[in-house]
């Protein structure tokens, strides 16, 4: 493939999001400061649709759950990632990628040096992408969802 990076064929639909046109809305209480609390009910701004905000292109969006720790501390085990297949990866985007038919992995894309980087300092190795490597990119990380408690 001569070092060319290709995006995943749109016909492969892993964990595709289908909202069936229905949007769910939740109250928006504005911004929150990390200082002293105030009664949030006094500051209801409007309602937010997470669909409208984060699932703007459901036909080219899927979810994937993080396993492993090569991208810690930014990404942690069991984080949910909203992946966009229609975005072209830019320098330092985090992508779901396979090199030479290896398993797909989450890595930071160093477009300038043509490398895939694990951001965990315990992982010193980067994957250098060579001219003849076959690189398949499933998509670009668009949103990170992390549960703060285990009660959800």
Residue spans of the language-model regions?
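Short, surface-exposed secondary-structure edge patches
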Residues: 71-74, 85-88, 132
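Hydrophobic beta-strand signal
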Residues: 82-83, 96
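Structural motif
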Residues: 79-80, 93
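Short, positionally conserved secondary-structure boundary motifs
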Residues: 1-73, 77, 143-152
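Short, compositionally biased
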Residues: 69-72, 92-115
């Amino acid at each position: 493939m001569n070092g060319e990076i290709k995006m995943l064929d749109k016909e492969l639909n892993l964990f595709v999001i289908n909202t069936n046109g229905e949007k769910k809305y939740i109250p928006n209480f504005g911004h929150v400061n990390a200082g002293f609390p105030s009664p949030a009910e006094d500051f209801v701004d409007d309602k937010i649709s997470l669909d409208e905000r984060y699932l703007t292109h459901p036909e080219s969006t899927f979810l994937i759950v993080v396993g492993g720790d090569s991208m810690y501390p930014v990404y942690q085990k069991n984080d949910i990632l909203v992946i966009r297949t229609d975005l072209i990866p830019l320098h330092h985007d985090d992508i779901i990628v396979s090199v030479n038919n290896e398993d797909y992995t989450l890595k930071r894309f160093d477009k300038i040096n043509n490398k895939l980087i694990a951001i965990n300092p315990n992982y010193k190795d980067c994957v250098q992408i060579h001219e003849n490597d076959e690189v398949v990119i499933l998509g670009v990380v668009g949103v990170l969802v992390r549960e703060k408690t285990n009660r959800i």
